[in-house]
Amino acid sequence: MNFSALRRNLLVGSLSLALSAGLLGQAVAGEQLQKIKDAGEIKIGLEGTYPPFSFVDESGKLTGFEVEFSEALAKELGVKVKLQTTPWAGILAALESKRLDAVVNQVTISEERKKKYDFSEPYTVSGIQALVLTKKADELNIKKAADLDGKKVGVGLGTNYEQWVKAEVPGAQVKTYDDDPTKFQDLRVGRIDTILIDRLAALEYAKKAKDTTVTSEAFSRQESGIALRKGEPELLAAVNKAIEKLRADGTLKKLSEKYFSADVTQ
């Protein structure tokens, strides 16, 4: 075989391999959505300790805005929902390891996170909020981000709140937490001065816990979306279509007003 013939055969072989790889890629891309449909359920991760988004009520039932949103989402996808309560520190790792199909847990959409995960269109809009004990509000006088300088600030480990305060207020004394109950307990006993959480959660918490109050307007706008693994475009498209349907038929707004007495979905 001469060199030209050999080169031609190699080229044909390479093109065949590329075509096969492309077809395989298309098959894999749609595989997860089909797996979910075949199983008849979608595994969604949330904390279950983050009222009013997800929490256990007095009867022992898991409920909340994101619980009902997940149920409605699954219904639009034509499957049942399997809710798996998972601590925040490990919830995205559970998604990566395929123990979860999606995370619905106020995951803020950021450029850094978009490098690792795909996100649905936003389903809530909020901001970073400081929460303090009411009796210390005047003394702490937190009105803007710079006022956190020198303060003992509690944040969830690995959250956008941790990233934000370390970047924007390097003089803050940041303490990280794996769970919310410990964080709020430390606020009450004085181990920290303030907590940074989602504005919507802060307003709801302060409404129920009269010894706490929000200190100012939100420090920054943030949008939350459903986190999915990279490389599942058909699942992402199906999720976005479901969200658009829930927005159009008023379901999202209805759930928002039920838990927040306002439309926080846009």
Predicted regions and their residues:
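Short helix-initiation/N-cap motifs at beta->coil->alpha
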Residues: 67, 83-93, 140, 175-185, ...
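Periplasmic-binding protein-like
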Residues: 125-132, 199, 203-244, 260-266
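Extracytoplasmic small-molecule ligand-binding "clamshell" domains
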Residues: 31-106, 249
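Acidic, polar ligand-binding/catalytic clefts
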Residues: 71, 75, 80-147, 213, ...
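Ligand-binding cleft/hinge of the Venus flytrap
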Residues: 56-58, 70-79, 145, 158-177, ...
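A ligand-binding cleft/hinge motif common to bilobed small-molecule-binding domains
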Residues: 90, 107-115, 164-167, 184-220
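Short loop->beta-strand "edge-of-pocket" segments that line small-molecule binding or catalytic clefts
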Residues: 40-46, 143-158, 173
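Extended ligand-binding regions for polar small-molecule ligands
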Residues: 68-76, 136, 152, 156-160, ...
